[in-house]
Amino acid sequence: MSDIQLNTLKPAEGSKHAKRRVGRGIGSGLGKTAGRGHKGQKSRSGGFHKVGFEGGQMPLQRRLPKRGFTPLGQHLYAEVRPSELQLMEAEEIDVQALKAAGVVGQSVRYAKVIKSGELSRKVVLRGITATAGARAAIEAAGGSLA
């Protein structure tokens, strides 16, 4: 293999395409109308319509019905799995501890433990709710909900 030098670097064969030079004479194949065809709105300079415009026909985004909504409180609640509690070092866990450990996002105000995974160590939850299955798993491991 030869020495690579800055003045000998070249792009890979076929990786670069020559720029289309339009309107440069008949022989170029893109002269006169420059590949725009004859007449019509799209052949004119500045002759383009806005995205979604369908020539006056009711556009698709207005023909389709509105659907659903975005709940305003969706970022306030978070679900936590017992396996995530298992990885935390603290024995007493509240929402602030979950935020500090990166288990839930910073905008979360309320957390709920769901039954998904196993818990084998004692944890005390403060200000955190749990489903019936999760509560049973926490209490079986010697923990509690305060």
UniProtKB/Swiss-Prot annotation:
Q: Which GO biological process categories is it annotated with?
A: translation
Q: Does the keyword Ribosomal protein apply?
A: yes
Database matches in InterPro entries: Ribosomal_uL15, Ribosomal_uL15/eL18, Ribosomal_uL15/eL18_sf, Ribosomal_uL15_bac-type
Keyword annotations for this protein, in alphabetical order, are:
Ribonucleoprotein, Ribosomal protein, RNA-binding, rRNA-binding
Q: Which organism is it from?
A: Bordetella parapertussis (strain 12822 / ATCC BAA-587 / NCTC 13253)
Please give the name of this protein: Large ribosomal subunit protein uL15
Q: Which family does it belong to?
A: Belongs to the universal ribosomal protein uL15 family.
Its gene is: rplO
Q: Which SUPFAM superfamilies match?
A: Ribosomal proteins L15p and L18e (SSF52080)
One GO MF annotation is: structural constituent of ribosome
Q: What top-level branch of life does the organism fall under?
A: Bacteria
Q: Its quaternary structure? A: Part of the 50S ribosomal subunit.
Q: Locations of Gly residues compositional bias? A: 24-34
Function summary? Binds to the 23S rRNA.
Gene Ontology, cellular component aspect: cytosolic large ribosomal subunit
Supply the source organism's classification. Bacteria, Pseudomonadati, Pseudomonadota, Betaproteobacteria, Burkholderiales
- Annotated segments matching region Disordered: 1-65
